[in-house]
């Protein structure tokens, strides 16, 4: 009998074909960011490297000089082997896949740019937003009608996330704000094999790997891809959604308090290796139901990852409007997730905000009863859409 008791779960977008370079860059960005996000035994993590990559891609499109070079290096394009000249074409291909690729799982991706009335965009930048990101433009007044501007943004966010995220901003932005580049993504997937509600029962989950709590736990005997990796100290299960295009991958440390060490050592390469070594088998899965949201200001984290120039000190975003005095103030992301017997529903919005400088079962078991990581992925492109860490339920 194999028992898995804590987990890291990842929602990933993956393909049977080789990873494209933009996907490699996005996944690498997510794995490097995961250990830098604030975490505690009483605080969960949920974010989307995929959404962040798209929002930052729209900023990259307007960057020049050393600012663009720094973004190219630290957004993962360089280490993925994606030349500067091919980045925007890669986003265009990714956008086209979303527009033309049907699936049994709902994945809606939308982009927009909220632009201050007094900021004339360069024609070339407008063309890039439309062709590479299918982004629409919304003219707002951050100076004279700041509340109206955030109302427009929040309304767009609510619509594109199917009402899962009702607002991103609670108050007007700085009057010096000149642009907000936004990506929103909504995900709804039904398990290939749904859990029966009548089998859901109260079972133990060890919050922080230590404190025992009773939580609603789904139980099902399911044919999934699964394996144990004693050399890494982790058990892994991949739960497919209907249609097979998307899956949830759960990384469960073999030690109840091992999620932080797992998170620190996890890389995109190791993640792929673990997936490649999974075996199809019948497994009794114990998975807690959960629902939570998160919101992050990512400026400091991105700076720690090497992205500094865009936030001031010589930022070159002249490709947006020709104005050399633009910089990014912050990058924020808000995400929500719910996992239950039917499947998973998740939504995320990422925003790049910028403006003028101021001064006991038979067989195998997978028992998720302590902190874990989870990933939602596309099984066709290997892109990791969402990453989460559950510490407390």
UniProtKB/Swiss-Prot annotation:
Q: Which coarse location class describes where this protein primarily resides?
A: secreted
Give me the Gene Ontology terms describing cellular component: extracellular space
Superkingdom of origin: Eukaryota
What is the annotated signal peptide range for this record?
A: 1-16
Mention one GO molecular function. toxin activity
Q: Name one GO biological process term.
A: immune system process
Q: Which CDD domains match?
A: serpinJ_IRS-2-like
Keyword list, A-Z: Blood coagulation cascade inhibiting toxin, Glycoprotein, Hemostasis impairing toxin, Immunity, Protease inhibitor, Secreted, Serine protease inhibitor, Signal, Toxin
Q: What happens when the gene is disrupted?
A: RNAi-mediated knockdown does not affect time course of blood feeding, feeding success and weight of fully engorged nymphs.
Name its cellular compartments: Secreted
Q: What induces it?
A: Induced by blood feeding in nymphs and in the salivary glands and ovaries of adult females.
- Which tissues does the record link to its expression? Saliva (at protein level). Expressed in salivary gland. Expressed in ovary during blood feeding.
InterPro entries for this protein: Serpin_CS, Serpin_dom, Serpin_fam, Serpin_sf, Serpin_sf_1, Serpin_sf_2
- Glycosylation sites (chain numbering): 104, 265
Any idea what job this protein has? Serine protease inhibitor that modulates blood feeding of ticks on vertebrate species. Moderately inhibits host plasma kallikrein (KLKB1), matriptase (ST14), trypsin, plasmin (PLG), thrombin (F2) and coagulation factor VIIa (F7). Slightly inhibits host alpha-chymotrypsin, tPA/tissue-type plasminogen activator (PLAT), uPA/urokinase-type plasminogen activator (PLAU) and coagulation factor XIIa (F12). Slightly inhibits the extrinsic pathway while not affecting the intrinsic and common pathways of host blood coagulation.
The subunit structure is: Interacts with human KLKB1. Interacts with human ST14. Interacts with human F2 (thrombin).
Family in the record: Belongs to the serpin family.
Q: Please identify the protein, giving its name as recorded.
A: Iripin-3
Species of origin reads Ixodes ricinus
């Amino acid at each position: 009998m194999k028992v898995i008791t804590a987990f890291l779960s990842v929602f990933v977008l993956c393909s049977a074909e080789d990873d494209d370079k933009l996907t490699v860059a996005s996944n690498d960005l997510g794995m490097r960011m995961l250990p830098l996000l604030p975490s505690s035994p009483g605080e969960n993590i949920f974010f989307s490297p995929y959404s962040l990559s798209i929002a930052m891609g729209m900023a990259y499109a307007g960057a020049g000089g050393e600012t663009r070079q720094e973004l190219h290096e630290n957004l993962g394009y360089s280490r993925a082997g994606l030349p500067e000249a091919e980045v925007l074409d890669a986003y265009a291909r990714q956008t086209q896949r979303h527009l033309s690729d049907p699936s049994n799982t709902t994945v809606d991706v939308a982009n927009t740019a909220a632009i201050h009335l007094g900021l004339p965009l360069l024609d070339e930048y407008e063309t890039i937003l439309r062709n590479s990101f299918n982004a629409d433009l919304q003219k707002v007044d951050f100076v004279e009608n700041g509340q109206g501007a955030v109302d427009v943004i929040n309304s767009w966010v609510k619509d594109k996330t199917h009402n899962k995220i009702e607002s991103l901003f609670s108050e007007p932005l700085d009057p010096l704000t000149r642009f907000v580049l936004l990506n929103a993504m909504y995900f709804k997937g039904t398990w290939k094999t749904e859990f029966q509600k009548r089998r859901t029962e109260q079972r133990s989950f060890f919050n922080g790997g230590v404190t025992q709590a009773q939580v609603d736990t789904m139980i099902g005997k399911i044919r999934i891809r699964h394996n144990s990796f004693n050399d890494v100290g982790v058990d892994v299960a991949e739960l497919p959604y209907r249609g097979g295009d998307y899956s949830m991958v759960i990384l469960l440390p073999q030690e109840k308090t091992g999620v932080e060490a797992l998170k620190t050592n996890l890389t995109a390469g190791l993640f792929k290796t673990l997936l490649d070594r999974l075996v199809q088998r019948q497994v009794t899965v114990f998975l807690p139901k959960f629902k939570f949201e998160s919101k992050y200001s990512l400026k400091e984290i991105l700076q720690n990852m090497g992205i500094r120039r865009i936030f001031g000190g010589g930022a070159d975003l002249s490709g947006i409007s020709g104005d050399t005095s633009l910089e990014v103030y912050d990058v924020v992301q808000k995400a929500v997730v719910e996992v239950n017997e039917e499947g998973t529903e998740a939504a995320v919005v990422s925003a790049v905000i910028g403006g003028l400088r101021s001064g006991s079962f038979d067989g195998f078991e997978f028992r998720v009863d302590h902190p874990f990581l989870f990933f939602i992925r596309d099984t066709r492109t290997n892109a990791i859409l969402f990453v989460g860490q559950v510490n407390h339920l």
